[in-house]
Amino acid sequence: MKLPIYLDYSATTPVDPRVAQKMSECLLMDGNFGNPASRSHVFGWKAEEAVENARRQVAELVNADPREIVWTSGATESDNLAIKGVAHFYSGKGKHIITSKIEHKAVLDTCRQLEREGFEVTYLEPGEDGLITSALVEAALRDDTILVSVMHVNNEIGTVNDIAAIGELTRSRGVLFHVDAAQSTGKVEIDLDKLKVDLMSFSAHKTYGPKGIGALYVRRKPRVRIEGQMHGGGHERGMRSGTLATHQIVGMGEAFRIAKEEMAQENARVLALRDRFFAQIDGLEELYINGSMTSRVPHNLNVSFNYVEGESLIMALKDLAVSSGSACTSASLEPSYVLRALGRNDELAHSSIRFTFGRFTTEEEIDYAAKKVVEAVSKLRELSPLWDMYKEGVDLSQVEWQAH
């Protein structure tokens, strides 16, 4: 077993060796290095063939038409393209957008930008279980609503929203529905032939593919129109200009092909690992699971250890790569906005740790990690006067602290 142990698979995943091999074949002079847009010679034709094969592999994982897949630089760009693209194209129809308070920053900050441009955005509050329901969406719908954007799987707490029910609602009301699915490919079944979803964002690096490549699903029937945000050579049917990165696209295609083949057994294995880990830390007092345990992806466990500062726990767990909050916001010392939206107080939000397991996690690593967590939490609590007061039965919420 090698240290440190990586337990932050929701931040990023290592590239699968099979993916790296396919990518390496698209770089050198004797490989498939051509520009897919070069129509006048065999180097371009071969590259285009590889790109279209990858487009088909991405489409097959989510049961879409390959023509509905648009390449982007990642899920952040896909979110921007979907939300701004719809808002700008359909602004004559209405200027109201619905999203939730626990979306990824790529969605929230895009919506904030649209607010500066004169759009109105409603931010839904999840229940304590971290779920956004169709009833919540329905209550916020208005005559001038043009778009609903709700994530499939939450990046911090791993909860899975019922996008099928939300899709039925939005389609019946003639409102477009965008789903950020960066965290769900390879973990949750997605069937875009059945789901009434109009736009869906994908990322390669959350699914054992390379960073810097993603895709946006744009439905053809009923047809969804978006305004391109990147202008240039008119690539991707005008929706996203820029020379296609063959090696990254091929990597994403291969990663999604593997995800389709191995998802069922992979999920069962990772769920067993998570259950094994949780069983070993469950004996700790004042341990709170964040988000629903039933509507949740198998690889995520987000827990708060009361009376322990999350940052100090991460420092104590120097052999474990884990995070508090998401990777994109872990540099800030603010408590997780996702956990605050669930109704957690600042103390519990600050004491949360996200453990995420994946393809290369072993039982040996799980057992070692659980042992280290129990030791670190117990040690930090021994040092905490608040823990002593709690153990003595003092109600800390009633204590009036003196300011110095």
Curated annotation (Swiss-Prot):
Any GO BP annotation: [2Fe-2S] cluster assembly
Under PANTHER family, the record lists:
CYSTEINE DESULFURASE, CYSTEINE DESULFURYLASE FAMILY MEMBER
Could you say which cofactors this protein requires?
Answer: pyridoxal 5'-phosphate
The species this protein belongs to is: Pseudomonas aeruginosa (strain LESB58)
Enzyme class, UniProt record, top EC level: transferase
Positions that bind [2Fe-2S] cluster:
C328
Superkingdom is Bacteria
Q: How does it assemble?
A: Homodimer. Forms a heterotetramer with IscU, interacts with other sulfur acceptors.
Q: Which residues carry this modification: N6-(pyridoxal phosphate)lysine?
A: K206
Family classification:
Belongs to the class-V pyridoxal-phosphate-dependent aminotransferase family. NifS/IscS subfamily.
Example GO CC term: the record gives: L-cysteine desulfurase complex
Write out the GO MF terms: 2 iron, 2 sulfur cluster binding; cysteine desulfurase activity; metal ion binding; pyridoxal phosphate binding
List of catalytic residues: C328
Name one matching Pfam family.
Answer: Aminotran_5
Q: What is this protein called?
A: Cysteine desulfurase IscS
* Role played: Master enzyme that delivers sulfur to a number of partners involved in Fe-S cluster assembly, tRNA modification or cofactor biosynthesis. Catalyzes the removal of elemental sulfur atoms from cysteine to produce alanine. Functions as a sulfur delivery protein for Fe-S cluster synthesis onto IscU, an Fe-S scaffold assembly protein, as well as other S acceptor proteins.
Q: What is its EC number?
A: 2.8.1.7
- Residues bound to pyridoxal 5'-phosphate: A75, T76, N155, Q183, S203, A204, H205, T243
Keywords assigned by UniProt? 2Fe-2S, Cytoplasm, Iron, Iron-sulfur, Metal-binding, Pyridoxal phosphate, Transferase
Task: Name its cellular compartments.
Answer: Cytoplasm
Coiled-coil ranges per UniProt: none
Its pathway is: Cofactor biosynthesis; iron-sulfur cluster biosynthesis
